[in-house]
Amino acid sequence: MTLKTMNDMQEDVDRYIGQFKEGYFSPLSMLARMTEEVGELSREINHVYGEKPKKNEEADKKIEEEMGDILFVLICFANSLDVDLSESFDEIMHKFNTRDKDRWTRIEESEEST
């Protein structure tokens, strides 16, 4: 499997959605779907790392699968609103690197190599 850029992923999702008459859902429906997927990830995290084991009849899902679902919905959401996620990522990293540059205790170079 080849590594894809965010632009590649956005194009792949757009091609996939483009084959259906319905196209992208409305922003409000997309947000509801995102909330649903985050809830499913939360449930899996709780089963794996929390105090609530799965019921015997519950299917095994992987955390990776739930994260993939969230990524797919996020890309659908971005595409429907003409948001370039690569640009959004660059902008948010710039914000964190400037706003929060002194917020956290940095690892010293000697600590990184150990």
Predicted feature locations:
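Flexible "arm" and connector segments at domain edges
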Residues: 1-67, 71-114
